[in-house]
Amino acid sequence: MLAPRVIIFTTASLLGSPTRTEYEASEALAEIERRKIPLVLLTRGTRAQLEILRRKIGHAHPFVTEGGGGLFLPDGYFALRLEGAKRAARYLCVPFGRTSEEAGAAVQDIAEQAGAEVVRYADMNAREISSNAGTSEREAEASREREFSERFFFAGNADLAAPSFEKIATERNWRIRHCEPFWELYSGNDEGKAVRYVTRLYREALRSRLRSVGIGASFEDLSLLTASDQAFILPLRAGDFDERLLAKLPNSVRIDVPGAVGWNQTVLDVLSRT
């Protein structure tokens, strides 16, 4: 088998749910497996959340969690010395973001300085998170297992509390994003940095200049797509692209079909030209 000539980076959510009998992404996944193409999954969720999908599709390649908080490499995947890597169960983890413990403490400190009342994920159980987020308790529990960020909500009026909280957070080199109905505090998380890092590892390990392909759909995928050699953008819904993303990446390839069907089409097209 020849060494692969392409690496595929993708937002994991685009693969959809593989629980149905007819799984729309199955053909592309089978071709990826047959050709031994590296498929790197990225998520703004946690490792525990992504593991659910990885088990279902038999994913055995590196992955990136919490919006670039950490890169996880299966044990023995690269025969390279990785400076700064830490053991995390059966993976080596290269952290880019600050830890969830640091983020949790910062949430509390910033809230006190801002005069805001907050409730952190760490203060809630799975049932409470499930009730607020409208997810299953299993999904809520997986979401609680954060490693590079902390989620919370404002107990009072968020419109009044959030601006002051964000100002103080920024001054302390933290960033905040709204993940309805929660907010999230993080620092250092960078999907683009993770993509460039793992691309370099592949090129060093295989002694080949592989082409990197990025597949995304929303503005939050910008750093992933920018860090890839070629960007493919799927619509959020049929005929509805994220115009902010298109404006930033005028040379990207637009795919007309959303979701797992569009993802499947994109990957098969990429592989047919490789």
Residue ranges and their predicted role:
Residues 77-82, 133-136, 268-273:
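Short, surface-exposed amphipathic charged segments that create phosphate/polyanion-binding patches used
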Residues 1-9, 56:
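Non-catalytic pre-domain segments flanking phosphatase-related domains
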